[in-house]
């Protein structure tokens, strides 16, 4: 059974209250734009307004059981839906989508990061040959690695790349939607980013993890185009992308907020199918 993420997209302000109750304010919930809840096993998440749950329940249960076949105005995606309901007195739009906690191959497991991973993250992320190639500075302490796990890797679009043989995270893999991407991409597109610890370079691990993430993004999330980029000084990353089906767009990109952002990056793209 799949986890389902529920996101409040917007609250439409109306002057007239919806007259469902004698005193609708007593039944209302405080719902803010961007607020999220996670539904486990198709159950109503704690803190979600009962009035909203009544409307979305059948959609959430269907998605949780892998029975969803919904099409909304934003994404051509059978694993998501956008619905409108109310929090007791005002209409609210919600986006509901399935979330994968784990993905795996014969030798790799992609799972959520844990704070207990901080020490091993630091072991690989403190290497000056790793971070700068991906646009971020080498970690300076275990505490810094712990903060990254809390504030960056806590996203539900980021996974630790774990070698099953050792049970140890050896890298990171994730995707960005059009709202969080470093580059300008379409609403139905995503951007993929990744890195692998230096001791595991040239073993096919990065290619294996990227193919797994591409399968998820194309066949579960149903993105139309998948984008990525790499520094011209890091051609090995480009070869990994080429093996996985990416093609060069003949465009160079610069991201000033990244470490080394003043250097050229090659932009690549993968079409669905």
Question: Where are the language model's segments positioned?
Answer:
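Short, Lys/Arg- and Gly-enriched loop/turn segments at beta-strand edges
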Residues: 44-54
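Acyl-donor (CoA/ACP) binding surface of acyl/acetyltransferases
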Residues: 99-129, 162-273
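Short, structured beta-strand/loop micro-motifs enriched in basic residues and often containing a Trp
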Residues: 2, 8-22
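A short helix-loop-beta-strand connector motif used in the catalytic cores of GNAT acetyltransferases and
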Residues: 149-160
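Short, compact, well-ordered microdomains
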Residues: 59-99
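A generic structural motif
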Residues: 43, 137, 174-176
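Short, flexible N-terminal segments of the mature chain
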Residues: 19-44
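Conserved GNAT-fold acetyl-CoA-binding loop/helix
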Residues: 129-150
